[in-house]
Amino acid sequence: ITHRKEYRYMSTSNWEDAKARSNYHFNKWHKDTDCVEHLGKFTGGWQTELQSVIEDAKPLNWGNRREGTGRENTNVNVEAEENDLKTAGADPKMTIYRGLKDFTKCPTLQRMTDYFEMSPVSSKLHTQFTGEVLNMHIDKLYDLDADSDNVLRIMVMLQDWEPGQFLMYGNEQFDRWRAGDIHKFDWPNIPHATANASNKPRPMLVITGVMTDKTRGILAKPIKKKV
């Protein structure tokens, strides 16, 4: 499916607008088992440098999550996004996660980003501290390429899973990951959410970009890479 780069909001709800664009079934009683696409694993010793920057990540909400990305005003309707939280009785300015894009002190994260050979590409350390919640939504990356099939979003889990940490894709709960595990999902269609009810921060690297032929070659087989 080819999506246009731009679209207009059809409602005052980001969630309802996203549902109208998606081909997901939205049947909560149908048990999803195939929403998470496992790509392989990075190995290496990044824990010390990760710990040195985890406190540097800036708390973000729906309104400021794109600051410094160059996509601040693209496919964004903060009012509709915040309306979903208000309707649910939540604080529309609540912290949804903490973001860090400066990898000067954690060069391994830059090597992970570069490994996938995407162009253009951006990445950020996406950390949730205890009590932080990113409510159900569907991503809006249509501005990156005229054909959404060329746009890839990859998650690298940076520390072992702790009970109370979860990512939800569709209605499939993703947990029990190990440090270095890599996955992706069908971002134009799959609703997802993340939360941390554990007693430790949950860091992951989110890499987003346009695939090249080299990227497709890398994804053609399971990843086993020391970084």
What spans do the regions from the language model cover?
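Intrinsic-disorder/low-complexity, polar/charged segments enriched in Ser/Thr/Lys/Arg/Asp/Glu/Gln
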Residues: 34-37, 120, 151-153, 204
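Non-heme Fe(II)/2-oxoglutarate
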Residues: 2-119
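Catalytic core of Fe(II)/2-oxoglutarate
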Residues: 160-227
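Short, flexible, solvent-exposed loop/turn segments with mixed acidic/basic and small polar residues
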Residues: 29, 143-145, 196
